[in-house]
From Swiss-Prot:
Glycans are attached at residue 20. The M2 protein from most influenza A strains is inhibited by amantadine and rimantadine, resulting in viral uncoating incapacity. Emergence of amantadine-resistant variants is usually rapid. Residues 44-97 are intravirion. This is Matrix protein 2. It comes from Influenza A virus (strain A/Memphis/18/1978 H3N2). Residues 71-80 have a biased composition (Basic and acidic residues). The record marks 41 as: Seems to be involved in pH gating. Forms a proton-selective ion channel that is necessary for the efficient release of the viral genome during virus entry. After attaching to the cell surface, the virion enters the cell by endocytosis. Acidification of the endosome triggers M2 ion channel activity.
């Protein structure tokens, strides 16, 4: 017998995988969580530009326009666009009356 075989034998007997065909709820829950984590990580790496762009721009929406007439909305959009077009390198503050 080689030294390698003598060292491996007790480890294989003591620490062998005992979770094959296991119906232990903790093992099942850990497996499901692990698989979901792997799937979410893969999706995050594949679509991270789309996901983070959505959150970045989605959370920076302007004020609510509910109840505001369409003419005032259009005027506000034009003022915003003119401010952006006027100077792209400096911050422009628009005060609404």
């Amino acid at each position: 017998m080689s030294l390698l075989t003598e060292v491996e034998t007790p480890i294989r007997n003591e620490w062998g995988c005992r979770c094959n065909d296991s119906s232990d709820p903790l093992v099942v829950a850990a497996s499901i969580i692990g698989i979901l984590h792997l799937i979410l990580w893969i999706l995050d790496r594949l679509f991270f530009k789309c996901i983070y762009r959505f959150f970045e721009h989605g959370l920076k929406r302007g004020p609510s326009t509910e109840g505001v007439p369409e003419s005032m909305r259009e005027e506000y959009r034009k003022e915003q666009q003119n401010a952006v077009d006027a100077d792209d390198s400096h911050f422009v503050s628009i005060e609404l009356e």
